[in-house]
Amino acid sequence: MSYSIEILRAADKFLDKLSKQQTSDAEAIEEAIEGLGETPRPPGCKPLKGYSGIWRIRVGNYRVCYQVDESVLLVLVITVSTRDKVYDALRRHLGR
């Protein structure tokens, strides 16, 4: 069963910027996001405390935060950033 993947604008902008600076990191993140379409909760993913329904995967020094909507088989990538900035970005996007 495949899930559709939707990437919010801010996460997409981060990936575009990263692909110009560090191509291999951007490719690894994009591969990990594509993998979420087949396995939305891969080994090593973690639910985020204080954020109901939001999951996190690590890709090197980067974090991908996303939601899974089982009713429509959708993975929504909310934010992608470095470890030290991803949680601030997540709070901004969720208005917390």
What is the predicted role of each segment?
Residues M1-E30:
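Arg/Lys-rich, positively charged N-terminal/basic patches that mediate binding to nucleic acids
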Residues S4, T23-S24, V59, Q67-R96:
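Enriched for short, Lys/Arg-rich terminal
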Residues A10, G53, K85:
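Residue-level recognition of oxygen-bearing side chains
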Residues F14, A32-G35, P47, L76-T79, ...:
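Residue-level recognition of specific faces of alpha-helices
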Residues S19-K20, E34, R41, R91-G95:
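A generic structural signal for secondary-structure junctions
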Residues E31-I57:
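A short, surface-exposed loop/turn module that caps and links secondary-structure elements
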